[in-house]
From Swiss-Prot:
Domain of life: Archaea
Organism for this UniProt entry: Caldivirga maquilingensis (strain ATCC 700844 / DSM 13496 / JCM 10307 / IC-167)
InterPro entries, alphabetized: ATPase_NBD (IPR043129), Gcp-like_dom (IPR000905), KAE1/TsaD (IPR017861), Kae1_archaea_euk (IPR034680)
Function (record text): Required for the formation of a threonylcarbamoyl group on adenosine at position 37 (t(6)A37) in tRNAs that read codons beginning with adenine. Is probably involved in the transfer of the threonylcarbamoyl moiety of threonylcarbamoyl-AMP (TC-AMP) to the N6 group of A37.
Protein name stated in the entry: tRNA N6-adenosine threonylcarbamoyltransferase
Main subcellular localisation: cytoplasm
Length: 331
């Protein structure tokens, strides 16, 4: 079976092609906003529209397949930025109609999890999903990915990206922020907000900005915001691990590239004799392959959607998505 997947939830448009065993192509282009600015949804959509056909051709050439060879077309139905989502959905619908292929809707967050499981070999993990749009601890139970902790406001990736922009660091901001953090010597007091199993990062960002404006050494503020954010993630993950008794932890999403987060989570895993899996860097950020792979799992389980019903979903919780491809032997 061969599936083409299109990702376009935010700043990246990606086209991936997979078969039953491997990724055949993973071609992506990222919209880079002006220095110091965040993503403007319509500018991102314009970027995606310009790149879409070129990316489809690149992916087909890389995979050495034709559109007529596809068994189905998958697309990121949500959640995400409306204008950006519509570009990917439109391209997917066009291919589905022109070539008579089934259309498969994919939840962006589920796709991050499934590509991480596929590339690491994890079977039944507790997942720390951390990116610019997601911050949650989740695991499969009863036919869905259930949430065992999440942000109450902004994502950890958004928090750190905004602070990096405030400092004038180049895009992508988090790696440069962590480089600055490594030069820090003193941990400063910042809001550490964990309520039950939920976290808050908005106040952390605001307090860090205030410290910089007060003249505190920037490197120390970087060290403090990064470590405080990641320690919060570690606490919530550890509690969920103790509750569920999982023996695997997966870090998925763009922030999974962080070596600092990985080192902290290695400590958590070792304390519970769990195996830590981290999604490979090329599949950590938004990418087409994760949509294609999750689309393949879904389509083989009988999931497809009509053109009329393929409206994008800007807001779509991960625990609203049925997961029919995981067998009942996984609790």
């Amino acid at each position: 079976m061969i599936i083409l997947g299109i990702e376009s939830t935010a700043h990246t448009i990606g086209v991936g092609i997979v078969n039953d065993n491997e990724v055949l192509a993973n071609e992506n282009e990222t919209y880079t906003p002006p220095q110091g600015s965040g993503i403007h949804p319509r500018e991102a959509a314009d970027h995606h529209a310009l790149k879409a056909s070129h990316l489809v051709k690149r992916a087909l050439d890389k995979a050495e397949v034709k559109l007529s060879d596809l068994d189905a077309v998958a697309f990121s139905q949500g959640p995400g930025l409306g204008p950006a989502l519509r570009v990917g959905a439109t391209v997917a619908r066009f291919i589905a109609i022109k070539y008579g292929k089934p259309l498969v809707p994919v939840h962006h967050g589920v796709a991050h999890i499934e590509i991480a499981k596929m590339t690491t070999g994890a079977k039944d993990p507790l997942v720390l999903l951390v990116s610019g749009g997601h911050t949650m601890v989740t695991a499969y139970s009863g036919g869905r990915y259930r949430v065992f902790g999440e942000t109450m406001d902004i994502s950890v990736g958004n928090c750190l990206d905004m602070f990096a922009r405030f400092l004038g660091l180049p895009n992508p901001g988090v790696p440069h922020l962590e480089e600055c953090a490594r030069r820090g010597k003193v941990m400063l007091e910042l809001p550490y907000t964990v309520k039950g199993q939920d976290m808050s990062f908005a106040g952390l960002y605001t307090a860090a900005v205030k410290l910089v404006k007060e003249g505190r050494r920037v490197e120390n503020v970087c060290l403090s915001i990064v470590n405080t954010a990641y320690y919060m993630l570690a606490e919530v993950t550890e509690r969920a691990l103790a509750l569920l008794g999982k023996r695997e932890i997966v870090i998925a999403g763009g922030v999974a590239r962080s070596p600092i987060l990985r080192s902290i989570m290695e400590i958590v895993a070792s304390e519970y004799t769990a195996t830590l899996h981290v999604v490979p860097p090329e599949y950590a950020g938004d990418n087409g392959a994760m949509i294609a792979w999750t689309g393949l799992l879904a389509y083989k389980s009988g999931v497809s959607i009509s053109i009329e019903d393929s409206v994008i979903k800007q807001r779509w919780r991960i625990d609203e998505v049925p997961i029919p491809w995981i067998t009942s032997t996984v609790s």
